[in-house]
């Protein structure tokens, strides 16, 4: 779970990209995440109206079909049917124009801001950086100021346009990742394509465990809410958690290092 951008203070957090960074919460249940968020959230957050008992959920169909593996897409449809039978309204929604560019634009912002933060140390200690971070910082140093500002302009347009999406639904429903969780030995958490847009726009989001893939590793669905609607998001996620009743545990030892 992560709240809206700025909902939890970044004081004391070493930044990766200051305009993208969020403090997130890993918890066993939605209730646990809500307790931690209540303790950490900025006290000036405005209260939000509670979410409807059975929410209106919008599936960004084109986004799903472009990036989700077949197994993940099939699982999301099964989850949507389960939620619909429990009373949720589920329909398709369209993301704003430019959604196909959001990942590239967000990565540009990430690269530049990482390069800016590390500009003092990187020339002296480049060899000490992990290869992926070294590549990230190096590539950010080559981006022009004009391109960075144009990316921020495109970001602002997309964020503003997202408000219209929530006129036809309470929350987006989509996978947490385009493929099942990768084995531990691969050393990666997977492709962030379904999560990155919400860091880019600052919208709150929450992933709910919802099943196991054919290989026994976890699957999860994700809810995305309008800005500053964390309380409503947590209410809706509690409802989804109760409806889905997912309690199985992946066979983690089978997928760890030998």
Predicted segments with their positions:
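Short helix-loop capping/hinge segments that flank enzyme active sites or metal/cofactor-binding pockets
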Residues: 54-56, 108-163, 209-220
